[in-house]
């Protein structure tokens, strides 16, 4: 009897962050194949690490940082820029009569997240996200992203020159000639990563994010409907029928109105 857990199934084995949140410099977290629990008091960095995972293994267009906080109706105040900059303190500026933030990394800099996966049967891949900011970068749309999917185990240490030189795609291809995928946007990269990991449906990623970040799962029936049951094709047919009926009803009303107007003059 083998002690290997789910051989052939890719599982996260290592999380790396570089200049992410208050984790300054390089930090590496080894993840047990049997399962991993992140716990600690408020402000210890739990959500920071989970959010790091979701920047790569996340659902494009539906991402929320610090979802556990926003779930309770609060605004998390976290986004890609605050994580890269290392926001750590809010202060009231008496002179400006405004709230200002303190950052660990205010100037031009780069951040990185790395996820290493192993199938425990010899297969290994690494997914990397490099994020470059200029001194003037203040919004997420201004962050220059580079997503890399590579065979084997690759460290963010190997990406330092890429990060320092604005994460050029040509430089990345030259440094890593065996690239599996390279993209500027999460959506196509996520599709390539899911294919490699054997995840057929994007809904599985949404469910992963939900279970990772939720303080409570709430209504189990609703959870099943939203994340585990595909929407039947009949829903689309019903929507189309309703839309066509509305158009037909409008056209009929127009004809009736025109006919009534013509009868007035008879």
Regions from the language model: what does each represent?
Residues 1-157:
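Extreme N-terminal "head/tail" segments of very large remodeling/mechanoenzyme assemblies
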Residues 36, 54, 119-259:
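Extended, charged alpha-helical "arm/stalk" segments used for dimerization and assembly
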Residues 67-72, 243, 257-262:
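Juxtamembrane/interface motifs at transmembrane-helix termini
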Residues 264-266:
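Conserved small/polar residues in nucleotide/adenosyl-binding loops
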């Amino acid at each position: 009897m083998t002690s290997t857990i789910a051989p052939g199934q890719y599982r996260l084995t290592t999380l790396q962050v570089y200049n992410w949140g208050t984790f300054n410099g390089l930090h590496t977290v080894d993840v047990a194949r049997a399962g991993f629990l992140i716990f600690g008091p408020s402000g210890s960095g739990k959500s920071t690490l989970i959010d790091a995972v979701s920047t790569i293994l996340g659902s494009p267009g539906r991402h929320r940082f610090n979802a556990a906080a926003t779930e309770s109706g609060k605004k998390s105040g976290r986004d890609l820029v605050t994580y890269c900059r290392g926001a750590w303190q809010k202060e009231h500026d008496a002179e400006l009569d405004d709230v200002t933030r303190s950052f660990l990394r205010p100037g031009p800099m780069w951040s990185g997240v790395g996820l290493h996966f192993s199938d425990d049967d010899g297969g290994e891949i690494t997914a990397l996200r490099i994020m470059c900011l200029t001194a003037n970068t203040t919004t997420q749309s201004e962050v220059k992203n580079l997503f890399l999917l590579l065979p084997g185990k690759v460290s963010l240490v190997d990406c330092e020159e890429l990060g320092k030189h604005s994460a050029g795609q040509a430089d990345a291809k030259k440094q890593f000639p065996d690239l599996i995928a390279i993209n500027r946007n999460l959506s196509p990269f996520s599709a390539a990563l899911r294919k490699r990991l054997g995840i057929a449906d994007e809904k599985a990623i949404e469910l992963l994010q939900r279970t990772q970040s939720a303080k409570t799962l709430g209504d189990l029936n609703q959870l099943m409907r939203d994340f585990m049951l595909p929407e039947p094709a009949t829903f689309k047919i019903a929507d189309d029928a309703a839309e066509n009926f509305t158009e037909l009803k409008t056209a009929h009303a127009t004809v009736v109105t025109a006919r009534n107007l013509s009868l007035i003059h008879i």
